[in-house]
């Protein structure tokens, strides 16, 4: 199915392109869908990010400049629409009916179309030149190690592979229940919302928007996608790849804007459902503005508990380091607080964590710029924590050295601060200690067997319930902790982690009816479709039937 596409890609890669400057630019990088070269992005060769609406790519009246997070050089110009330019996007969404672009009774062949698109897109991302392109582009705008960036591409590829062939139409599987009499039967269907919106953050420029965009499209919706402008170049290029793989250009719109303009689009277009991934503050505002027509995957102050059984100390330390500091802690699933059983506190765990954290360096981006929290803000938070009685700095707590990261971003060494459990629970301290710092920063504390109820109390009082880890193979301990907590994605066992949002299991919060999942069939059906019941009652009516008395 995808062989002609791949052959075309390879043929285009070696062909000499002539003609207009557009095509020279478009194909100069040997990838027929690409309009940029990740390696060449610079102030001297800035890239441009456009908008897509009603099947056409276009600019705006003004350009927003994105600076290189590693050196501060302006290197990307984003065509951000302002409040006077939103009409085409509002009209485009408004043209989509509530019953969607397809549903089980309308254009069912489009389920097969999206199976084909997924097949082609998955294979495209398996081509080393293509996966390298996206991994490097991610690194340029959301600096993380190459391993982390490539992992994001690979998860996206596997997601596409999961929804090839008939798998898209299987998402719309219905059921039937026998009725009360001959000719009656009730049938349940998954139904699209129609016009929808997707808003995604900077930290996963490819994985989050692709998985949510495709989920929306699979179920028959028409989405308007907005990605944080700092990183939207990645998804703009992915949209072009999807068009190359057969995505109809009018099926999805792509907009660059600030929050104010996007909010106005939502209020005027009135999408039937909006998916928001990002900060809790914005999430709560949108929930009010959109009158509840929203699904959220917002901030997470994610916890890890080390149980009483101490095993594989080096492995556990390595996972803790990865959970807290990979991507410079800029994951919504990053380990924010570590509860150590006293048995673990008696081991060299903290010194091992310190050694692992100190291996991280800017040169390979195992630590790097923090895009939403400044250095001053992180150090100020640290200093406030250190005012708590018994608190102490375990490691880090200093700015990165010898760098050119602009001051609008953060640059600190991986940091851990110890706060006594008794102090954490105090009303005067709790909100401070559990404030999410979206950077390489974690709180560490210790507990005894008798203090497990205190740990559970601390978890119960948290507001966000995204990911969690219970590191123990003690079945009774696991049962106690899992039974008294709520986090939507909870890893349990010796190898438990807080991070890792692959395509093979649910990732999302629990405990909130607005909670959104991502990636799996269950998540797609929950977020991007609703239940519709159709009751057939075709008769026959008995020949002996008579009009009964009124009731």
From Swiss-Prot:
Residues that, per the record, bind NAD(+): 278-283
Endpoints of the signal sequence: none
Tissue: In uninfected plants, highest levels found in stems. In plants infected with the flax rust, highest levels in leaves. Higher levels of expression in infected leaves than uninfected stems.
Domain of life: Eukaryota
Function: Could be involved in facilitating the biotrophic relationship between the plant and the rust fungus.
Recorded family membership: Belongs to the aldehyde dehydrogenase family.
Name of the protein described by the UniProt record: Probable aldehyde dehydrogenase
Organism of origin: Linum usitatissimum (Flax)
């Amino acid at each position: 199915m995808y062989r002609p596409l791949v052959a075309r890609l390879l043929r285009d890669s070696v062909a000499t392109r002539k003609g207009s400057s557009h095509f020279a630019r478009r194909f100069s990088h040997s990838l027929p869908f690409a309009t940029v070269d990740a390696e060449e992005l610079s102030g001297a060769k800035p890239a441009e990010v456009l908008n897509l609406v009603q099947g056409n790519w276009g600019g705006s009246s003004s350009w927003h400049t994105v600076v290189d997070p590693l050196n501060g050089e302006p290197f990307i110009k984003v065509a951000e629409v302002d409040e006077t330019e939103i009409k085409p996007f509002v009209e485009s969404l408004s043209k989509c009916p509530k019953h969607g672009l397809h549903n089980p009774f309308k254009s069912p062949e489009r389920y097969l179309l999206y199976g084909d698109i997924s097949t082609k897109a998955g294979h495209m991302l398996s081509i080393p030149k293509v996966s390298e392109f996206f991994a490097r582009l991610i690194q340029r705008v959301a600096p993380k190690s190459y391993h982390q960036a490539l992992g994001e591409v690979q998860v996206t590829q596997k997601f596409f592979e999961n929804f090839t062939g008939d798998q898209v139409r299987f998402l719309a599987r219905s059921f039937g229940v026998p009725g009360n009499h001959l000719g009656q039967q009730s049938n349940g269907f998954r139904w699209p919302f129609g016009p929808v919106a997707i808003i995604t953050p900077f930290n996963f420029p490819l994985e989050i928007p692709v998985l949510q965009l495709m989920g929306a499209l699979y179920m028959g919706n028409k989405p308007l996608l907005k990605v944080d402008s700092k990183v939207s170049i990645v998804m703009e290029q992915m949209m072009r790849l999807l068009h190359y793989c057969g995505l109809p250009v009018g099926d999805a719109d792509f907009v660059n804007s600030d929050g104010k303009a996007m909010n106005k689009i939502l209020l005027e277009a009135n999408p039937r459902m909006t998916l928001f991934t990002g900060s809790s503050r914005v999430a709560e505002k949108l929930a009010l503005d959109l009158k509840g027509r929203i699904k959220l995957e917002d901030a997470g102050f994610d916890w890890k508990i080390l149980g009483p059984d101490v095993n594989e100390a080096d492995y556990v330390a390595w996972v803790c380091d990865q959970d807290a500091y990979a991507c410079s802690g800029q994951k919504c699933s990053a380990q924010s607080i570590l509860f150590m059983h006293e048995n673990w506190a008696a081991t060299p765990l903290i010194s091992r964590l310190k050694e692992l954290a100190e291996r991280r360096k800017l040169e390979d981006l195992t630590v790097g710029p923090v895009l939403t929290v400044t250095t001053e803000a992180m150090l100020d938070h640290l200093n406030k924590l250190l005012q708590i009685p018994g608190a102490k700095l375990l490691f880090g707590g200093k700015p990165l050295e010898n760098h050119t990261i602009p001051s609008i971003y953060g640059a600190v060494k991986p940091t851990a601060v110890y706060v006594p459990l008794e102090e954490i629970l105090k009303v005067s301290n709790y909100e401070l200690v559990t404030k999410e710092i979206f950077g390489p920063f974690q709180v560490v504390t210790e507990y005894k067997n008798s203090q497990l109820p205190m740990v559970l109390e601390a978890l119960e009082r948290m507001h966000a319930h995204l990911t969690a880890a219970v590191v123990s193979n003690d079945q009774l301990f696991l049962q106690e902790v899992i039974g008294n907590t709520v986090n939507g994605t909870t890893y349990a066992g010796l190898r438990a982690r807080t991070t890792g949002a692959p395509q093979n299991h649910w990732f999302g919060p629990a405990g909130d009816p607005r909670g959104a999942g991502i990636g799996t069939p269950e998540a797609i059906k929950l977020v991007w479709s609703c239940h519709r019941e159709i009751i057939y009652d075709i008769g026959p009516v008995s020949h002996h039937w008579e009009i009964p008395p009124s009731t």
